Amino acid sequence: MGMLNCLHGNNMSGQHDIPPEVGDQPEQEPLEAQGAAAPGAGVGPAEEMETEPSNNEPIPDETDSEVCGPPEDSKSDIQSPSQAFEEVQVGGDYSPPPEEAMPFEIQQPSLGDFWPTLEQPGPSGTPSGIKAFNPAILEPGTPTGAHPGLGAYSPPPEEAMPFEFNEPAQEDRCQPPLQVPDLAPGGPEAWVSRALPAEPGNLGFENTGFREDYSPPPEESVPFQLDGEEFGGDSPPPGLPRVTPQIGIGGEFPTVAVPSTLCLAPAANAPPLWVQGAIGRPFREAVRSPNFAYDISPMEITRPLLEIGRASTGVDDDTAVNMDSPPIASDGPPIEVSGAPVKSEHAKRPPLERQAAETGNSPISSTTAEEAKVPSLERGEGSPTQPETVHIKPAPVAESGTDSSKADPDSATHAVLQIGPEEVGGVPTMPTDLPPASEDAGPDVRAEPDGGTAPATPAESEDNREPAAAAAAEPAAEPAAEPAAEPAAEPAAEPAAEAVPDTEAESASGAVPDTQEEPAAAAASATPAEPAARAAPVTPTEPATRAVPSARAHPAAGAVPGASAMSAAARAAAARAAYAGPLVWGARSLSATPAARASLPARAAAAARAASAARAVAAGRSASAAPSRAHLRPPSPEIQVADPPTPRPAPRPSAWPDKYERGRSCCRYEAASGICEIESSSDESEEGATGCFQWLLRRNRRPGQPRSHTVGSNPVRNFFARAFGSCFGLSECTRSRSLSPGKAKDPMEERRKQMRKEAMEMREQKRADKKRSKLIDKQLEEEKMDYMCTHRLLLLGAGESGKSTIVKQMRILHVNGFNGEGGEEDPQAARSNSDGEKATKVQDIKNNLKEAIETIVAAMSNLVPPVELANPENQFRVDYILSVMNVPNFDFPPEFYEHAKALWEDEGVRACYERSNEYQLIDCAQYFLDKIDVIKQADYVPSDQDLPRCRVLTSGIFETKFQVDKVNFHMFDVGGQRDERRKWIQCFNDVTAIIFVVASSSYNMVIREDNQTNRLQEALNLFKSIWNNRWLRTISVILFLNKQDLLAEKVLAGKSKIEDYFPEFARYTTPEDATPEPGEDPRVTRAKYFIRDEFLRISTASGDGRHYCYPHFTCAVDTENIRRVFNDCRDIIQRMHLRQYELL
């Protein structure tokens, strides 16, 4: 049928369910399609727009009955907003199936509150006359506001129109009334104007099974566009003349709307049409001949309110849309309906005539033979929006038809069917050639079964077809001329596709299953018993897509005159071939009507004959062509209810099923079918294989393994193959394979062994790792306990106070020292007592000797007054010492010891040493200078007294671990980090105690960094900062007043008085609790207690009771003194440790 699609300006793809606004949507002019409208005897389309029928003019319907009524004003319909829609049965009790409803949404952009109404003729009781609109009502530009319908239908994305218009907005447009041509070619045209009542309150329908949100399946969408120039054609579905779109003002499409009832007037000279019923045609038409052979009740086509609106989201240009029914809208240009035969006629025709039609004796309408052009859009070639129009030869039946003069020439010569890229099937009546084997699709051009023509494939493919296919096509094409040459005495008796011969049936059935070219592209099933006959699954990427259950028989497969009888297996093969067929444009289910069920057996037989002829014609096709598939979607629930699925036929005997048709078991079976090495197709093995045998074949099958190694390796499998393999015809083959003498080892068994071995190794590794983890955890626990039981001691003090000497004494006393005396035996002590460590100390001792003599000689000239040599002959010795002062890596030759010994014996050098408080001299200078004769020996080994006195500048952090009476001590010496003390001091906030070392004899000395700062004053300042440090406020301090031997020497010498550096000493008296050493001079006792009280004054002045100061008088170089002092401190340290962990 002809149709005119109207889309508003803003109805683009992706704008779904957007209600129109007043002045929002630009209106579009109707586009002029290619060709002219079918000529008629009556007034033309332009005249009909201005002509009103007389009041008593009869309005013939489809069933040879006239409805006459008094004239009624169209305003009466406008004023009845609650008028209900009544469904009138076709042929007495016909209700159109759900899939025949219009898949479009008709929206009036600016008609205000006017809605289309259904005109019910005859006995329905509703107004039956043709009512004319007031021109003001039809104007879309009426500023009354657009309101979306309450029951408006919004199509899903796949059912929207596959094209979009972008037209400039116009102000006022006048929409012409609907125009319906005569039933027969050349007849007068009747126009039907519609009145738009107010918006009805209830738009539901009772018997059609629709809801207000009904969504038809995608295969019923429109597969072509109307823009002839841009989209490749403007022809209607076959059998109907082309629509002539009316071009309005400004180039905009007017919105088309029509009531559900169409009252059509036939031509006066129209030949009678035999219309048995409304079922059985591939396309339902809105017209019937008034000259029926028998009288039936008035037929009214009832359908839901349809709206042509914007395209939904996700709609492409190649979306398939059903064209079973003409798109009828509320207002718009006329829709022309030709006198093509009716699809539904086949279901209700008399048994004799239906039998004659099934055997191929039905006359062919002359109109069906004059279709000349069919566009072809091959996959992968060209754009879907610009298909190529292929000119083909008209069928010979066009010349022999007796009524060909009455046919519409324009509809026969200019009808162009635009087919989407997914429609690859064809129905060529007289194929001049076959499509090339390399193409993706089967026949790349196909016409509609009821289109009145059977176009052939393009002539360009003649070079590519095979000779066998051409030879098969010629004899099969001869019978087509015989039934086609008969005069069309009954133009609507039977569509041309029902009388298509063998060649036509082959094309209608889609692809050929035998050649594997199109395994899933057979025709739509000829029997409704096939639930998936609507279309095959779409693509291999969509294996779950199933066919529409409500498919019906393709009418092209209805009659094959030249087909011979077929066996049951052949018929089953034809049914299977039809099951996997491509989408047949316009095919729909008829199982909802009883009349259709009556004709199912005859259609099944016709489908079998059609499949047989199809295999004969396509025998020469290549099997390498890729299959073409149509993108489909499962039907809506309404269609499934209308057409319940019927039992599925037996599996088709195709050579290799397509990917989306094979399940998991089929794939496994084909992969394992090579174990018997049967060099044949899978036709025999596939049919005989059962689920048990498939399980047997794939039991030990692994992906990626060669098939030759899957037999003979498993005894259980061999047993099943020998015991039950005879049921499948594979026992001998399996036995021969399993008993082959040169059989290699099964790689799967080797792989399993390797995997077991690796698993065992992995378990052993895990066990070892677990054991190691437990050992690590145990070690961590032990270290944690040791850490908690260890007394950590931090050594702090000013430079050259003797901290390193204390550490050395601890090693000597408690770590077996350097000579193995006075400590505990352990491995660490043994390593520290090695001769290698003592050897390294020899170089340090020599460096101390060299540094001492160089410092004294250099100070002789720098002191004020300078000191002269007692023996001037030793001047060259002084020059030698000064010359080697800055020599790195000095090797200490014998002359060095000779010059050093001579200078040390000089009285002037001794006098300079007495003034050592005026310059920086190491404390061990006198000790090592007195032992020059011992140190210069080559086999010199330092003694335990030499090692503590060795002076090495501390430049880092040194730690020493020792144990006293099974109590662990960890001592840290950080004396070399004086400048950055504030940055690292907080790291020792968890130590047990702080041992602060003070050089008591340094009261008359300056620090090495600054010659103006007194060393003892520097020690007092450092002690105060440590005592008041916020990180160390809870840590007690053990004060070591070191170098008591040197202090006694200075006090007794009287050369450097303490009151000269600390005036407070002059007023200081010895405390009563002072305990002097045996034989100690009282002056020495007074001096050492003065220094002690200076530090205690700082601790008591800022003490808060959380930490205490414990002073001790020590001599770091005296090992016994350090032992006694440290023993006294052990009790204090342990008490501090218990208080630290809150145990005391």
Curated annotation (Swiss-Prot):
The modification ADP-ribosylarginine is found at residue 951. Residues 343-356, 370-381, 743-767 have a biased composition (Basic and acidic residues). SMART domains: G_alpha. Residues 31-46, 467-499, 518-558 have a biased composition (Low complexity). Residues 745-772, 837-863 form a coiled coil. GO terms for cellular component: apical plasma membrane; COPI-coated Golgi to ER transport vesicle; cytoplasm; cytosol; dendrite; endosome; heterotrimeric G-protein complex; membrane. It holds the Pfam family G-alpha. This is Guanine nucleotide-binding protein G(s) subunit alpha isoforms XLas. It comes from Rattus norvegicus (Rat).
